[in-house]
Amino acid sequence: MSILFNEEEKIFHIQTNNSSYVFCVSDYDTVEHLYYGKKIPDDNVKYVSNRQIYAFHAHESRDSRKFSVSSVGLEISPFNSGDFRTPSIVYNYDGQLDCNRLRYRFHQIYKGRKSIDGLPHSRNTEETETLEIVLSDDERNIEITLFYTVYASVDVIARSQKIKNGGTMSLTIQKLTSMCLDFYGMDFDVITLEGMYLYERAQISRASLKRGVFKNGSTAGLSSHNHNPFIALCAHNTDEDIGEAYGFNLLYSSNFSEEVSVSNLGDTRLMIGLDDTGFLWTLKAGESLSSPEVIMTYSNEGLGGMSRNFHDHVRQNIIEKEYAFQPRPIVINSWEASYFSVTEESILGLAKHALDCGVDTVVLDDGWFRSGIQSGLGDWRTDKARFPTGIQGLSKKIHAMGLKFGIWLEPEMVNPDSDLYRAHPDWILSTSKLPLISRQQYILDLTRDEVVNYIANRITEELQGVELDYIKWDFNRYATEAGSFVTPQGEIYHRQMLGAYKLFSILKERFPVLFETCSGGGGRFDLGMLYYSPQIWTSDNTDPYARVFIQYGTSYAYPMSAISCHFTKGDCTSGRESTYEFRYNVASLGTYGYELDLSEYTEEDKAEFKKYSQTYRKDEDLILQGDLYRLLSPEKTSFCAYMKVAKDKNKAQLTFLELQATGFVETMVLRLKGLDPAKAYKNEETGCVLHGATLMNVGIRVGDLVRNKRSAGYSVTFPAVD
């Protein structure tokens, strides 16, 4: 069992393979956090609780000053209940902001897990166990359930909560987090993934905690290019390989909040959940509301160990089993080749060139139903002038060539110049007669079932008979004036996301193919999207030098198989030149494809591309199933280096990228990581055979990698040998 309960002491001890999470029910029926960290024996650790009562701290008993909720760690912290730290839940009953006192009532432990209403979540597995803690506010008949689902083999605990109004009057929720976690002490650095459009997650922000509140989040109606739902706490001396690291990530794709606060006593509180800016959710009698799920992991093997825990969990328990460990398509996308001028003739020409390059899937991007950004979204009607046989006929021709076929959609949007908008101007998110516009489009009001069903049916009708293998789902603007003609204002953002998830579910059931999501590049790169699509377009920035930073940061929280990386023209966003080999080595960190006009390249070029496609297929098992070890950070050096290592340690691949000419790259010695110390490995470049222990301690000379000194990007494979 992963979940232990000491009935006499009322202590819960959640164990994974390498971590322990311990909390208890206090003498006053509050749920008190005690410990999270390296795995420990099942001892009574109540002694760590702070029973000191400080001046102005309220305490439970008039006769005793032994317990104050302001002094101890808590699993949930209601507002106005004696805890003066940032609350994790705020609600009022019948318009009164009452004292939100919550008491433990009962718990249950069981194999498996429950789904979360309308929300993505970690999937059920044979090893999964769940603990439910039920608390109540008896004065108002309000019930809150805390969920802890354990994935022991990957050192992950998934947390969420559910609030139910058991009373007779309305309950208004002003703040609902997914988890609250308290630590005694503040000796932490906080790490987040920051960025912007064309530079998502490229800035790894790390700072020491100080007294006060640190907040990371989004209010844009999506997880955003600027901030990511991942956050980590680590010791000051933690690096890639050594030290304690706690990682957290929210399975959600809209507005979120991550708050880290340090109290006057120097204790640390982390809360993650729905952003409460403008949030106001009403529960009528008998109704309930579930929070999104947070996954959390602990590692004492540095940030690299934390990342590998996340990678394993996402691949094993979030991405659909059908795709998680299966070869992915090598695609050619029409956008960089044709933009809005794409035609049936041009896409068939692109397909012919693709056959010469080892590509197996042709993706028709934006332009199949319109010639610019001004119109077409929402109507989804094929431009028969440019596609005379329709998408159905085109897909059949692509299949006849021995290729697979994919198509681009943006189902959540509508153009003002569309039949749909003219017929239903009230079907958009807006609070104004003159709504703000972005990219010549509005966001459809998916809080309304009739809108969700209409879009699902319109797309289904248009794609009827198409021989479809792949769908790219885009989302190209932020939400502004987010209001609805039918939905309460304070519920808009969350109901909108629930509607989007519903639309995903409908279309995935009707089109059981591989989905790849996108949002102006990586604006919705989160675990909520990975529940529906096994890979995400990482960024619209296809400059390989910039992609090094983007992909490196993304790898902190997301597995290689989720990071969509393509070989590109190389200079389309920055003008910087790069060699083919450098571009391939950058793109081979994740799932592979091409973003360029193949007709512009020679037969020799296409032969080179085919070689890259074949190399990718040969090494794809490392991307789908292997472990990632980061060796050199591009933020700290002029280089980037990482290793992909098979789970059985029988194969490894080193990639080294030179971002700036330094003149001493050939003199560098690089220590490898992740190998089996006792196994011998052959360097396929030099033929040299050395033991893993030697390669990880002595290292290799980088100059031995250099074949073409102008490349600046090198990879070498190390198979284990007898």
Pin down the residues of each PLM region.
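Short Pro-Gly-centered flexible turn/kink motifs
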Residues: 99-106, 281-300, 712-719
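Active-site neighborhood of glycoside hydrolase catalytic domains
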Residues: 388-390, 422-424, 428-581, 591, ...
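Conserved, mostly hydrophobic/aromatic
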Residues: 18, 161, 286, 332, ...
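C-terminal beta-sandwich/jelly-roll accessory domains of carbohydrate-active enzymes
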Residues: 660-722
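Aromatic-lined carbohydrate-binding/catalytic grooves of carbohydrate-active enzymes
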Residues: 323-460, 464-466, 470, 478-481
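Glycine-rich, aromatic-flanked loop segments that form ligand/cofactor-binding clefts
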Residues: 71-73, 78-112, 242-255, 298-322, ...
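Carbohydrate-binding surface patches
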Residues: 231, 240, 633-677
